[in-house]
Amino acid sequence: MKVFILALLALTATTAIAQLETTCSQGFRQYQQQQQPGQRQLLEQMRPCVAFLQQQCRPLRMPFLQTQVEQLSSCQIVQYQCCQQLAQIPEQIRCHAIHNVVEAIMQQQSQQQRQERQQQAQHKSMRMLLENLSLMCNIYVPIQCQQQQQLGQQQQQQLQEQLTPCATFLQHQCSPVTVPFPQIPVDQPTSCQNVQHQCCRQLSQIPEQFRCQAIHNVAEAIRQQQPQQQWQGMYQPQQPAQLESIRMSLQALRSMCSIYIPVQCPAPTAYNIPMVATYTGGAC
């Protein structure tokens, strides 16, 4: 019975990962065919990273038997996708891409969550997530971005969409999956790990000279999803809260993906980034 259950769990996880990779690969084909990736294409690649940083995973359920036990969580799938997409983003623009992921996450936070004590706790937890991001994806991401050339709006949007899984992961929005087995609790990966893998893969495919700005764009897009009144005095890129969120994002993606990102990149003063769509774990 135990062998049957383990085999069934492995088959379920393999099928879910294969479906997510097939869906994501279709959206990234256009970027891979170009020598110089467009901003829209890069942002599309970063969509799993945004989802991973935000951890907006949804639970999966298997309707058989009657006893539910915690098994696969969609967050590990998102984590796998995040690392996968982050690795595909060229090293030159990973830093900016991660920056934008964090800024977009901060934009989505409620006004109550922006209180001083809660903000300090969020920065601490975000810093830990960023540090784990590089280790998790086995891809290098520097803490700060170097000066990079400005990207076009289409290129910025592409980078932002590529990092969607990473944003989902960093925002702790994963939901556990329950599988109804009779009294057999099993600890299994979550879909966020799969999105994490995609995030790292996409980030590694972004040219090195564009990675810093790409991460910046993702963080900015997440930030813009919150009401403007929640961000009074924080819209300028030089604000400490914004800079801190970018720094923590770079640390996480660098550790999780083990991918190179320049130490410092210019502030996105000329950026005009559309909002990132919320990643639900079922699509990129």
Swiss-Prot record:
Post-translational modification note: Contains disulfide bonds.
SUPFAM superfamilies, per the entry: Bifunctional inhibitor/lipid-transfer protein/seed storage 2S albumin
GO molecular function per UniProt: nutrient reservoir activity
Domain of life: Eukaryota
InterPro entries the record matches: Bifun_inhib/LTP/seed_sf, Bifunc_inhib/LTP/seed_store, Glia_glutenin
Keywords: Disulfide bond, Seed storage protein, Signal, Storage protein
Signal peptide (UniProt feature, chain positions): 1-18
PANTHER family: AVENIN-LIKE B5, PROLAMIN PPROL 14P
Protein's job: Seed storage protein. Might be integrated via inter-chain disulfide bonds within the glutenin polymer.
Family: Belongs to the prolamin family.
Name of the protein in question: Avenin-like b4
Native source organism of the sequence: Triticum aestivum (Wheat)
